[in-house]
């Protein structure tokens, strides 16, 4: 994917599910890191911090927080957006628990970016006009 994006650097891409790191073995996570680093080279890539369930590994909250934190570090907090993937994520965690996990990851690596990751980046990436609050 990263090589394809090199040919179209103006293309904006929003990567779902934190790059989907299903294989949680050391080799699998290293492959995920390499892919994420390659995608990080393209400024048009934004990562949705969502859904870390894996058919290959049991739900592990601490491991998921670490993956979220690493994704934020690799891509940069200005190119990450919060997402939930509910109702699917609800198979493993409540919405409140998922939000708390993402907030813990943000606090580990970019506490100053909480507002950006949870709100501002999505407004920018999706070009939302929300100058007026919903009534």
Question: Positions of the model-derived regions?
Answer:
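Catalytic pocket-lining loop regions of alpha/beta-barrel enzymes
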Residues: 1-81, 134-135
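Divalent metal-coordination and catalytic microenvironments
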Residues: 17, 47, 85, 114, ...
